[in-house]
Amino acid sequence: MKLLRRWWGVIPAALLVTIVWPERAFVPIWDGSVYMQCVVDAATTGLNVHSLRCGGHQSQLYMGLLALTQLAHPGNLTAIVAMNLALALGALAAFNAFLRKLLPGETWWAERALIVTIIAVHPLLAATLVQLNSDFGVYVFFAMSLAALAWRRYRLAAVAGLMLCFSKETGALIYFAALGLHLLFRALEAQGSVMDRVKPVVRSAFPALLPLIAFAAFLAWWSATQGSYAVWNQGIHERPVEGMHWFDFDDVIFRSYAAIIFILGFAWVPASALLADFAIGALRSVRRMGSRALSGVDAPLAAYLTALTATLAYLLTVYRTWSFPRYFVVLAPLLLLAAFISAVRLGAGPRARRLILVAMVGLMCTANFCSWDPVSRAVFGTISLGERRAYDVSSIAHDFRVTDADHLCYNLQFTGFHWAQNAMYAAMKPTSRTTIVFPRFNRWGLWAPLDATTFVRVARAAQTVMPDYRDEAMVAAMRDTMPRELWLVEQPNDGDTLAVQKLHHDYADADSARYTAHGLTLTARHLVRRNAEVLPSGAHR
């Protein structure tokens, strides 16, 4: 038993690596393509505050770590995945440290081990790790900041907090909330007047305040010297503050956010425990029955955890944009931790707790590769990917012209878009003169160079071929110089793009082929110019 306890930490790490490592050649798509290109370009042209502002976010420190992996060989995706895995393992260690504070003693070792395992195999973690984005940096450095604050290691909190603030603007907001609540709870525990409580707390925790001071100073410098907004806006709103909806709880985007946080991918399981605990607590409060004991649990830290979870659930839904699950990746472990405390408060014994946690490990492992949660299917509906189905995450808000894009990045099924395209390109063997058309509203982040030998999608520039990628509007604008033939790529998430109808004005169907990989199927339609001589097979190459 002692040996098992000593080496259990290897199991979550091994499971995460086993889940993620097979996707190390995945070339990020959609928004992930923007971040990938930013990192590669920064490594090529030079690392600075501008080149590392990826996707319009103040992400310099996290993206800087990824860019370091590209200095020797730009476009090395394996190095990026390896760096993200190393950071993820650091986050798991941080959550374990937090749990040792929350659930101290050897009597809780099995629960701590199982909770860390659930966090490690959570499908949203794997999806956010593989699909390059700044939210993964927020997740990692939030975990480290949380553990440092719980143990009152304020210098470590300062380092982790600085990385968190410069991973994404929401990272600074999250750190502000985590640190602010921490200081508040410490002050409430102290004795004396307000000033007598606040002064020693602020004095001892002052190093942890430095990241917020540095971030505020940086934003002030940016606003004074640069021509763009200091925080991400991306043209959605005339001013970033206009995206804030502090008290609008009847907004369709808010409803979509709430469903993602509390339902998507078995999130309703921990959410149900929280809801039951809240209902019973409210009833007991009305009846003035007193508080329920949390035997063996650090009660003040448990209260802090609950308050932080509720605060972040609110703050992360205030700014309304798109229904991308990665925006809420930090809430996944918090929801699990808070739900476990609720289960303890509800009276679940050790055997019941451990059985539930073991079941959750199984659910999360399988949820990485398929979308079989019946509640999520009922709430979101599904779309067919070919051999499998995925949750239609955009169905509530309908915030995209296509059916789903980064909405699908809640588990690893979305990587099938990359692998199915690889199968198509390997069969086509395109050259730079081969015209490949993606629908105008479903080409974002999908055009990539191909390896000159294997024709698989890659991120590097050397020894590659770049097909003549276009959309239907670009083809129509060519007029007399339209290619004799082209291939239209139809994907499961196209929606109503009308690309085929528009191309049929000038092109007729010749044939088509379907390509399937990782359960996802796409179709390549071969179209030829009307009244134009058709080249012999292979002559286009």
Where do the language-model regions lie?
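Membrane-lumen/periplasm interface segments of specific transmembrane helices
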Residues: D41, L181, F185-L188, P200-D277, ...
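Loop-to-helix entry region of an early transmembrane alpha helix in multi-pass inner-membrane enzymes
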Residues: G56, Q60-G64, A72-A93, A113, ...
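Membrane-embedded, lumen/periplasm-facing catalytic core of multi-pass transferases
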Residues: L149, M360-W444, P536
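Short acidic/glycine- and proline-prone juxtamembrane loop motifs at membrane-interface regions
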Residues: I29-W30, A127-D135, F324
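Hydrophobic/aromatic-rich transmembrane helices and adjacent perimembrane loops
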Residues: G137, F141, S167, L173-I174, ...
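Specific aromatic-rich, kink-prone transmembrane helix
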Residues: A94, G137-L156, A160, F185, ...
